[in-house]
């Protein structure tokens, strides 16, 4: 079985380096890494890094895409470039727990489902009680925001399965769905600081 790690990136210069280094180290030999770069809004630094890394390692594919403000369109374009039996979509500012990477093939081979929801550990440096109340968030003792925050991320590479919604996108066209256990070891990590969180919220508000 072949798995496609499918990544979207805009201006997350440090984060895309962290993610690619982890994936290149931990992925199975038959798996592929596919990166879709927002060439309309992205940074020169990210594009230069992708070009440089692609020449040096040749272990991932990357493609430019002029983002039109519609996240489902972005992810459907990303899917077109994937050749794996399953796709694991990851944003550039996220990264998977090593245990999840070590076990993902076994999980997929023993669970014949179209879509698997993945838990996510969100942390926001600088988060205050005022922010929590303003956004209606729940934060546990570990400081994780809205855990398990299930994400639509692992799905069969099938023509019938597609993304929809301009923001808060989700998958449609599947027959069966399941979720990973709500455990840190099987989660995506999503760390950010409060400044980036506020900018992201403002940006999403312009798209709704």
Predicted stretch roles:
Residues 68:
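Chalcogenol-based redox active-site neighborhoods
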Residues 3, 31, 60, 85, ...:
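Conserved acidic residues
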Residues 1-25:
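N-proximal low-complexity "stem/linker" segments adjacent to membrane-targeting elements
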């Amino acid at each position: 079985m072949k798995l496609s790690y499918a990544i979207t990136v805009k201006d997350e210069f440090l984060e895309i380096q962290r993610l690619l280094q982890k994936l290149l180290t931990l992925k199975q030999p038959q798996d592929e890494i596919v990166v879709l770069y927002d060439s309309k809004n992205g940074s020169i630094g990210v594009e230069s890094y992708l070009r440089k890394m692609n020449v040096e390692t040749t272990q991932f594919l990357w493609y430019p895409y002029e983002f039109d403000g519609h996240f489902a369109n972005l992810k459907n374009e990303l899917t077109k470039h994937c050749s794996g039996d399953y796709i694991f979509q990851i944003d550039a500012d996220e990264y998977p727990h090593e245990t999840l990477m070590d076990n993902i093939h076994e999980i997929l081979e023993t669970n014949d489902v179209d879509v698997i929801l993945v838990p996510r550990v969100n942390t926001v440096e600088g988060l205050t009680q005022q922010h929590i109340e303003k956004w209606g968030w729940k934060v546990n003792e570990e400081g994780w925001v809205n855990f398990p925050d299930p994400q639509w991320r692992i799905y069969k590479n099938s023509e019938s399965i597609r993304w929809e919604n301009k923001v808060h996108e989700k998958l449609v066209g599947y027959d069966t769905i399941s979720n990973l256990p709500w455990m840190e070891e099987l989660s995506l990590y999503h760390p950010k600081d409060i400044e980036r969180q506020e900018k992201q919220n403002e940006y999403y508000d312009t798209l709704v």
